[in-house]
């Protein structure tokens, strides 16, 4: 089944958030000595080369004088090698492995073993044996991948470029010699006016044709948005012109007045459009939350919000799009009672047990805690069993902030209308820390 661009965007967003959380965890870990191994394999590299290298490193580790350090490093290298042996060949986007003994809060140590297939190609090869995990190259995967097009035009010429992350690229530039307004009267003035109008029209046609050549690939825009920048009315004339490609008109996100042309104008246009570019990054988030708000405004009954009702709707299989705030303050507990029955509960972080035992305050039943993970992570690992799409949102956009404050940061768009009795405290936005399921 071929996935739509919208489906792929949902999945990319989840993978980005998953990696973001993993990096934060890895960066919080510390080890004693140099027993924490970071191995990054370029997508072009061969697995067996790195397997041989690790085997050689195990041999070298036998020369470490400290018995404890020698054992820790050897264990970490062996664990890394075991992870590597799970792969017959390098995955399409490369491979990242983190292995090593990590210090725990209780003073003990725990062996961490993580293998990661990046969601986009990684071009770096790295091997480090240190007291920390090295995440710098993996963090680069989180950098903004959206590409924006810029058209800089004035009476002297035009420049076409792109901005992707912090990389600025000039695609095309050309000069033009437009006649100035003629000061003399009579027939001469009329003739020069006609020539001037014709040359401006030809210039506009060349800019429009170049715009299509630069920013259309395979019959589709190859940039997320377009910025039209320039002095005078050239940029406005281009946007209004019937020569301007209809496929590009919907992605024009801003018109910018600048004082310069050429590359100086390009730099100025980037600076002056920063707010608009930042806003575009949240377009998908704003669109999904907007759909949720529309269902509520129209009172369709095809919406749900709040921890309790949303999880119940998920269990019934009625949620199409699950929307959650990225920093939900709830955990998902997997519990076992005295009769070996497995029970799931969702608790606010303030109410979560710190040890291996948990007593339900309402029923008085005691449980053994088998697992206790942030609810956001549980959603990321399990959402495909319950819903079509998962959207993880921030509070950076106005819609995201409203969703967090007004609906507790969790809700869903339903496949069909449900008769749901919403909890009064949730309807009144009085979020009860004791709320659990």
UniProtKB/Swiss-Prot annotation:
Disulfide bonds: none annotated. InterPro entries: eFR1_2_sf, eRF1_1_Pelota, eRF1_1_sf, eRF1_2, eRF1_3, Peptide_chain-rel_eRF1/aRF1, Ribosomal_eL30-like_sf. Keywords: Cytoplasm, Protein biosynthesis. SUPFAM superfamilies: L30e-like, N-terminal domain of eukaryotic peptide chain release factor subunit 1, ERF1, Translational machinery components. PANTHER family: PEPTIDE CHAIN RELEASE FACTOR SUBUNIT 1. NCBIfam families: aRF1_eRF1. Directs the termination of nascent peptide synthesis (translation) in response to the termination codons UAA and possibly also UAG and UGA. This is Eukaryotic peptide chain release factor subunit 1.
């Amino acid at each position: 089944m071929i996935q739509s661009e919208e489906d792929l965007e949902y999945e990319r967003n989840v993978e980005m958030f998953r990696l973001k959380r993993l990096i934060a965890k890895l960066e919080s870990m510390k080890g004693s000595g140099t027993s924490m191994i970071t191995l990054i394999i370029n997508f072009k590299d061969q697995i067996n080369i790195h397997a041989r290298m690790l085997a050689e490193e195990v041999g070298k580790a036998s020369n470490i004088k400290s018995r404890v350090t020698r054992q820790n490093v050897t264990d970490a290298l062996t664990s890394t090698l075991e992870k590597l042996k799970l792969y017959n060949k390098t995955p399409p986007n490369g491979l990242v492995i983190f292995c090593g003994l990590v210090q725990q809060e209780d003073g003990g140590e725990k062996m961490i073993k993580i293998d990661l297939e990046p969601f986009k190609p990684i071009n770096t090869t790295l091997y480090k044996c240190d007291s920390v995990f090295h995440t710098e190259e993996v963090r680069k995967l989180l950098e903004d991948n959206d590409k924006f097009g810029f058209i800089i035009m004035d009476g002297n010429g035009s420049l076409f470029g792109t901005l992707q992350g912090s990389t600025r690229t000039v695609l095309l530039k050309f000069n033009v010699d437009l006649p100035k307004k003629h000061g003399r009267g009579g027939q001469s003035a009329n003739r020069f006016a006609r020539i001037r109008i014709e040359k401006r029209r030809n210039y506009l046609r060349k800019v429009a044709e170049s715009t299509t050549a630069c920013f259309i690939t395979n019959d589709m825009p190859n940039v997320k948005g377009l910025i039209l920048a320039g002095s005078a009315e050239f940029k406005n004339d281009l946007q209004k012109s019937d020569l301007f490609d209809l496929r590009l008109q919907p992605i024009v996100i801003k018109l910018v007045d600048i004082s310069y042309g050429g590359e100086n104008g390009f730099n100025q246009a980037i600076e002056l459009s920063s707010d608009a570019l930042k806003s575009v990054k949240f377009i998908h988030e704003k669109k999904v939350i907007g759909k949720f708000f529309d269902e509520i405004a129209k009172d369709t009954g095809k919406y749900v919000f709040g921890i309790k009702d949303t999880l119940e709707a998920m269990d019934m299989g009625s949620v199409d799009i699950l929307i959650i705030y990225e920093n939900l303050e709830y955990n998902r507990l997997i519990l076992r009672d005295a009769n070996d029955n497995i029970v799931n509960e969702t608790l606010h972080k303030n109410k979560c047990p710190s040890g291996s035992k948990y007593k339900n305050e309402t029923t008085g039943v005691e449980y053994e805690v088998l697992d206790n993970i942030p609810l956001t992570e549980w959603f990321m690992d399990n959402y495909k069993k319950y819903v079509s799409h998962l959207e993880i949102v921030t509070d950076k956009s106005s819609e995201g902030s409203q969703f967090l404050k007004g609906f507790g940061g969790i809700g869903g768009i339903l496949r069909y209308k449900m008769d749901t009795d919403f909890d009064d405290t949730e309807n009144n936005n009085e979020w009860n820390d004791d709320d659990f399921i």
